[in-house]
Amino acid sequence: MIITRETDYALRILRVLLDGEKHSVAEMSETELIPNQFAYQILRKLSAGNLVRVSRGALGGCALSCDLDATSLYDLMGVVGERGILCACMEPGYKCRWQDKHGRCTIHCQLAALQQKQDEAFRAVSLRRLLTGGSNPQDTSKL
């Protein structure tokens, strides 16, 4: 799966924060149907990646701290620790026994080209566009 549950939950958390207000983890979890323990884990990553700001205490909560127009789906996936790779041989440093024995692998070359196109597409999609949608969900030309 290219978009994992963790990325999906991160997107849901950001969707709640679109209004610019502070929200509690409990509120976000309930609204977006995210288990509390996952919400806390993901918020730690989003905070470390400077996408959200977390404040503690009686007046605490979570708020958006990034420009959603300048942050891409690819960026978000990196923050949560995912690359969205098509297959294991796309991983940096992957050692392929088949290539070691036979040389150039046409399958790898084709998959690498697809991986590059996918990465470019994910970089081209701003989080704001992804989270707010459009009038026609089938139209991805503006993504």
Predicted feature locations:
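Basic amphipathic alpha-helical segments that dock to polyanions
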Residues: 28, 42-49
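Key DNA-contact positions within bacterial/archaeal DNA-binding proteins
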Residues: 37
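Beta-hairpin "wing" of winged helix-turn-helix
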Residues: 49-65
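Non-DNA-binding regulatory cores of transcription-related proteins
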Residues: 65-143
